[in-house]
């Protein structure tokens, strides 16, 4: 195939007079994946060479810094750990709907003299291009320092071998997972002293002997001497980089687009708008150009392909041709495609009498005994500490039960407990199911409509396969079986499927593929970047996020840890290249890339 230069997206002369800031690496997005890139480039676990000049890294984030420590988990505030259901409002306030179909039902009570639309229009952030039956209704994005890590559940399981791709061999996956777990602080002993954790584990191990019930891996640690938990987030990954003079974090700085050099096939500048800066009569004084040796886009599975589209990348063939019929080198058909999202079912139960009796009578240790001395049965019939930590348990993904389970108590944007019920008797069950990787499932971007930040409006086109629907039914049956052993349903929280997109685990929209396994044209047709997350055809542009995680397998578990693995791999590549220029040099395993091309993703 004949490719033309990047003439459609060459440097725009209108930006020529903008102030220029230079750095070695520009990271767009401040979630845990962007934080992983920053940490591994500036302070790698291995491979930093003494005497080398440390690279300069700038991180930009559209949203504001909303905590004293940049990117800290908001649930670390004691008030939310004392009143977990109040954290629901924090989650809801941190999520912004991605695509809302235009409502066509009229307001019949509107006074006749008042204006009203007579057809579909775009207002209040609605999207008239969205088919309501193909939408991920509950999908949302977070725009704040730390991204979704400021309110996530901190579940960090490794993908089962039936979920993860073979883009890396098993030894490399293990190495990357270990480093990711170290960065985010994954542990399985956080709740070892929780009474209800031990009770729920004991019940599940007795009733489901072949299911290997275990503590859910959590990116968290218990606060010494108190029944509080310190939840991990981007701030955990960044660590002391937040005080490093070589690292700069700019909040409320929005990357509007990338400018390319049509001679070198590189990103030459990123156009950044300071959203909070007052603007006087001088045009564009709130904008600057950042010139970086390497640019990393970590905006998440929707906002990353959105920025690429705004910058000139195209997925439709007719939009990518010049006047002579040559394809732009920014033509990547897979952009936005292969989108996967998990099905999700949910219920809440009130523990059975016999399990509550065990809570009341069993010897759970000195903390419980102290509580019983302080409060008699009339003061507290449950007889366990009021601040006993909530359980976090899982029945792991297997070939016969191919779904991820979280049997716990936590705050979501749904599932609050009525005040008349003792919250210590409530257990939530959340099941996450796979969806097959399908080329037809995608997110597209409008040429006409924009979001609140002037970026192309995303539109979903997503449908479950027949296999997905049947498997989700089996998943629901399994959840009902497990719930029935634990207790009876909390009224209003009976088993139910949740709105599409609520899992917030969209993957694959800029999927990776091992380079060299196919022809260049074929690789660009079915993927967006290589195993180091470098975009095809652009020498200095890397990606990060759930969007990089490829099929053909699909995941049911929380994919954050896996996305961090790709970021570690990409950072190793960038660090190695910077090392040649006198910054950092890194170690690379010769066996990192599996040369077997039968399963290259």
Curated annotation (Swiss-Prot):
UniProt-recorded name of the protein: Pyranose 2-oxidase
As for what it does, the entry says: Catalyzes the oxidation of various aldopyranoses and disaccharides on carbon-2 to the corresponding 2-keto sugars concomitant with the reduction of O(2) to H(2)O(2).
Q: Which gene encodes it?
A: p2ox
The record's InterPro entries line, in alphabetical order, gives: FAD/NAD-bd_sf, GMC_OxRdtase_N, GMC_OxRtase_C, P2OX, P2Ox-like
EC category name:
oxidoreductase
Leader sequence range is none
Describe the reaction catalysed, as an equation.
D-glucose + O2 = 2-dehydro-D-glucose + H2O2
Where do the record's region annotations for Disordered lie? Answer: 577-601
The catalytic residues are 505, 558
Q: List keywords of the entry alphabetically.
A: FAD, Flavoprotein, Oxidoreductase
Q: Name one GO biological process term.
A: secondary metabolite biosynthetic process
Instruction: Fill in the subunit field for this protein.
Output: Homotetramer.
Q: Output the Gene Ontology terms for molecular function.
A: flavin adenine dinucleotide binding; pyranose oxidase activity
Modified residue annotations for Tele-8alpha-FAD histidine: 151
Q: Where is the composition biased (Acidic residues)?
A: 591-601
How the cofactor is bound: the record states: Binds 1 FAD covalently per subunit.
- Domain of life, per the record? Eukaryota
Q: What is its EC number?
A: 1.1.3.10
Annotated binding of substrate, by residue: 406, 408
């Amino acid at each position: 195939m004949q490719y033309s230069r990047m003439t459609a997206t060459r440097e725009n002369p209108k930006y020529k007079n903008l102030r220029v800031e230079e750095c070695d690496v520009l990271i767009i997005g401040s979630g845990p994946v962007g934080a992983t890139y920053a940490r591994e480039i500036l302070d790698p676990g291995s491979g930093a060479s003494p005497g080398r000049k440390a690279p300069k890294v700038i991180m930009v984030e559209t949203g504001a810094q909303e905590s004293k420590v940049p990117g800290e988990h908001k649930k670390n505030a004691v008030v939310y750990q004392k009143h977990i259901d109040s954290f629901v409002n924090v989650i809801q306030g941190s999520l912004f709907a991605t695509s809302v179909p235009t409502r066509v039902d009229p307001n019949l009570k509107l006074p006749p003299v008042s204006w009203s639309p007579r057809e579909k229009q775009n207002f209040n952030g609605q999207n008239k291009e969205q088919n309501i039956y193909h939408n991920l209704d509950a999908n949302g994005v977070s725009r704040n320092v730390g991204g979704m890590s400021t309110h996530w559940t901190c579940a960090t399981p490794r993908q089962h071998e039936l979920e993860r791709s073979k883009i890396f061999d098993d030894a490399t996956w293990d190495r990357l997972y270990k480093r990711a777990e170290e960065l985010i602080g994954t542990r399985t002993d956080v709740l070892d002293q929780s009474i209800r954790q031990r009770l729920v584990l004991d019940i599940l191990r007795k009733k489901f002997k072949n299911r290997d019930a275990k503590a859910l891996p959590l990116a968290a640690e218990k606060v010494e001497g108190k029944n509080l938990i310190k939840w991990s987030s981007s701030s955990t990954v960044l660590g002391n980089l937040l005080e490093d003079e070589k690292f700069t974090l700019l909040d409320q700085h929005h990357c509007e687009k990338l400018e390319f050099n049509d001679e070198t096939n590189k990103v030459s500048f990123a156009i950044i708008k300071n959203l909070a800066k007052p603007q006087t009569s001088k045009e564009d004084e709130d904008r600057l150009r950042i010139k970086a040796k390497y640019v990393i886009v970590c905006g998440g599975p929707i906002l990353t392909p959105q920025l690429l589209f705004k910058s000139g990348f195209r997925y439709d063939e007719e939009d990518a041709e010049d006047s002579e019929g040559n394809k732009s080198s920014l033509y990547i058909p897979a952009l936005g495609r292969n989108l996967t999202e998990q099905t999700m079912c949910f219920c809440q139960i009130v523990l059975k009498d016999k399990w509550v009796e065990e809570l009341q009578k069993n010897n759970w240790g000195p903390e419980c005994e102290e509580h019983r001395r302080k409060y008699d049965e009339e003061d507290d019939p449950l007889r366990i500490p009021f601040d006993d930590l909530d359980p976090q348990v899982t029945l792991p993904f297997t070939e016969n039960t191919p779904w991820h389970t979280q049997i716990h108590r936590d705050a979501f944007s749904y599932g609050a407990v009525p005040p008349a019920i003792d919250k210590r008797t409530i257990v939530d069950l959340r099941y996450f199911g796979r969806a097959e990787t399908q080329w037809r499932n995608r997110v597209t971007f409008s040429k006409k409509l924009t979001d609140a930040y002037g970026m192309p409006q995303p539109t979903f086109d997503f449908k479950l396969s027949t296999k997905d629907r049947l498997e989700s039914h089996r998943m629901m049956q399994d959840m009902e079986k497990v719930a029935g052993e634990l207790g009876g349903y909390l009224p209003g929280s009976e088993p139910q499927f949740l709105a599409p997109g609520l899992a917030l685990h969209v993957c694959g929209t800029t999927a990776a593929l091992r380079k060299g396994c196919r022809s260049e044209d074929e690789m660009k047709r079915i993927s967006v970047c290589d195993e180091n997350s470098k975009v095809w055809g652009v020498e200095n542009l890397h990606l990060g996020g759930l969007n990089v995680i490829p099929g053909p397998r699909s995941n049911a578990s929380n994919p954050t840890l896996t996305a961090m693995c790709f970021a570690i791999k990409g950072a190793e590549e960038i660090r190695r290249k910077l090392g040649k220029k006198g910054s950092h040099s890194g170690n690379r395993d010769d066996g990192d890339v599996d040369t077997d091309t039968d399963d290259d993703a």
